[in-house]
């Protein structure tokens, strides 16, 4: 019998954590990666590694901007957000979180060894503390502040 692929076992364990924490995004992402790994599609991994985060951020940005583009959030509401203190505070927090996310992308790109820990931590936070899987990017940004890397 051939030896089991340790990387595949890790991916399966992370998928199981995703299922246990009811985090379908993590579960589906890992299952897709498993499918790529065990099929001839594995030749696409260099492309996924190079462009995956960029495409993910693009899709996330589309999702965030969709209510403005669809008209669900009107132009007057957007303009009004610059004069109410809660909205101004929301803008400041949004800038800070975006900055942290940028640091997170940089850290994850330059130190991929932290990715597994961030993912496991995110999944455990969802599973054990009823958290929301807002993402390893922000967690990586916070980590970059702690360890002093950008």
Swiss-Prot record:
Entry GO CC: plasma membrane
Main subcellular localisation: membrane
Membrane topology note: Multi-pass membrane protein
Domain of life of the organism encoding this protein: Bacteria
Residues spanning the membrane: 16-36, 51-71, 88-108, 114-134
Alphabetical keyword list: Cell membrane, Membrane, Transmembrane, Transmembrane helix
Pfam families (alphabetical): DUF441
Keyword Transmembrane attached: yes
Keyword Phosphoprotein: no
Location of the protein in the cell: Cell membrane
Disulfide bonds: none
InterPro entries: UPF0756_TM (IPR007382)
Family from the record: Belongs to the UPF0756 family.
HAMAP family the UniProt entry points to: UPF0756
Annotated protein name in UniProt: UPF0756 membrane protein YPO3057/y1423/YP_2679
Lineage of source species: Bacteria, Pseudomonadati, Pseudomonadota, Gammaproteobacteria, Enterobacterales
């Amino acid at each position: 019998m051939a030896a089991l692929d340790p990387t595949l076992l890790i991916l399966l364990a992370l998928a199981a954590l995703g299922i246990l924490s009811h985090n379908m995004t993590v579960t589906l992402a890992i299952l897709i990666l498993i499918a790529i790994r065990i099929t001839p599609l594995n030749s696409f991994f260099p492309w996924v590694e190079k462009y995956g985060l960029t495409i993910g951020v693009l899709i996330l940005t589309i999702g965030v901007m969709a209510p403005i583009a669809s008209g669900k959030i009107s132009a007057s509401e957007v303009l009004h957000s610059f004069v109410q203190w809660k909205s101004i505070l929301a803008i400041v927090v949004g800038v800070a979180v975006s900055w942290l996310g940028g640091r997170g992308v940089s850290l994850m790109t330059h130190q991929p060894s932290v990715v597994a820990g961030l993912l496991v931590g995110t999944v455990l936070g969802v599973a054990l503390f009823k958290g929301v899987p807002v993402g390893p990017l922000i967690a990586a940004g916070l980590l970059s502040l702690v360890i002093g890397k950008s």
